[in-house]
Amino acid sequence: MVDELGSNSEVGTLKVVILHRPGTELRRLTPRSSDQLLFDGLPWVSRAQEEHDQFAELLRSRGVEVLLLSELLTEALHSGAARMQGVAAAVDSRRLGIPLAQELSAYLRGLDPVRLSHVLTAGMTFNELPADARTDVSLVVRMHHDADFVIEPLPNLLFTRDSSIWIGPRFVIPSLAMRARVREASLTDIIYAHHPRFTGIRRAYESRTAPVEGGDVLLLAPGVVAVGVGERTTPAGAEALARSLFDDDLAHTVLAVPIAQRRAQMHLDTVCTMVDVDKVVMYANVVDELTAFTIERQPDGVTISDAAPFVEAAVRAMGIEKLQVIGTGIDPVVAEREQWDDGNNTLALAPGVVVAYERNAQTNARLEAAGIEVLTIGGSELGTGRGGPRCMSCPVARDPLP
C-alpha cells in the first residue's frame, strides 16, 4: 500500500488509481434514457466489464494499486455521517415531494453499506420501492410509471477522472456541469471525507460553485496546470480553480484553453494528453487552432495574458525548449474517427508509457514511431460513453517529477 498520495504531473510513474467497474447502472440505460444519461449507445455490459477487467489487470501488472470506487464507497458508508450525506444527496425532495422523500430517506438510512452503495450508484426505480417506502399520500408515486427512476443511476461513474482531481498532495472535488453527473461528486466527497485511507488529506478548491471537470484539467508539469474551457468547464470555473491553486501554493501558472463546445470535444483530454515529460498527443484538427490564456501568480495578485498558441504557451510555462506534438494522422477522416473513439485520451503509466484503446491503430502507430510504449486494451463497449483510459482513471498517487 502506498502511503504518500498526490500527483504533480500527468506522466510520473503511476502508483495508485481509482477505477469504477461498470455494473447495474449501465444496465439501466435504454434508448429512452441514454441521451439524457450522456451515452451515445447501449453498451453490452458483460463485454464492457470484461474490457474494464482487462484494463484493471493491465494496471496491476505494471505495479499500480487499483482502488475500486464501489468498494471505497461501501467501506466509507460504515460511517453514520457518510450515510446521511449520501442519502441527502440522492433524495431530491423538489422532484419527489416531501412525503415520498421522507419515507425514502428513512428506508435508505436503514440499509446496510453494501446495499446502500448499490442504490447510490445504480439508482432505483419506482417499481423497486419497498412497501414501507411507498406512501399512499404521494401524488408522485401515483403518477409515475414503475420503470421511472426514483433515484437516477450514475452510468458515467465509469469515468472517475471527472469527479475528483489530485493536484500535488491535495484533492479537488469539482462541480460537474451536466445534471446527469452532478451527484457523482457527492460520492467522491463521501469517500475522501469518511474513508480511512484518506484521513488527514486536505481539500483544494473549496468553492465548487462554477463548473470544473477533471477531464479538462491536465498537470503539464510541476506547478503548471492546463484547464480546458468549453462544454463542461466554464471560464469562471477555470479562474476560480486557478486562484485556489495559487492560494494553496499548488501551482504558479494555469493555462486556460478554449475548446469547441461540442460532444466530440467535451473535455480537453479528448483532444490532447501528455505522453511524456515533453511529448503530447493531439488531435490533428486542433493543433494549429488551440490557444491558451496564461494566468500567473504574482506577488500582488494574478496576471492574465492575451491568448497565444497553446504549444507556445505550454513551452514557456513548463520551462522546456520544445513540446513535441504527436498528431493523430495525416488522413483527416481517420484522424476524426480516431479522435471520436478517444485516440487522444491516453493514460500515462510512466514517462513514455501509455495505455490506449487498441482500435485507434493509426494514432497508436504514430505514438510508437515517436518512441512511446503503447499498451492497448479493448474498448468497443467502454467507449460508448465517449471516454478512454484517461477518462476512466483517477490517479491518486504518482512518483513526483522534479
Curated annotation (Swiss-Prot):
Domain of life: Bacteria
UniProt main location, coarse: cytoplasm
Residues forming the catalytic site: 391 (amidino-cysteine intermediate)
Subcellular location: Cytoplasm
Annotated catalysed reactions: L-arginine + H2O = L-citrulline + NH4(+)
Alphabetical UniProt keywords: Arginine metabolism, Cytoplasm, Hydrolase
A GO MF term: arginine deiminase activity
Pathway where it operates: Amino-acid degradation; L-arginine degradation via ADI pathway; carbamoyl phosphate from L-arginine: step 1/2
Recorded GO CC terms: cytoplasm
Gene3D superfamilies: Arginine deiminase, L-arginine/glycine Amidinotransferase, Chain A
EC number: 3.5.3.6
GO biological process: arginine catabolic process to ornithine; arginine deiminase pathway
Similarity-based family: Belongs to the arginine deiminase family.
HAMAP family: Arg_deiminase (MF_00242)
Name of the protein in its database record: Arginine deiminase
Originating species: Mycobacterium ulcerans (strain Agy99)
Gene that this polypeptide is encoded by: arcA
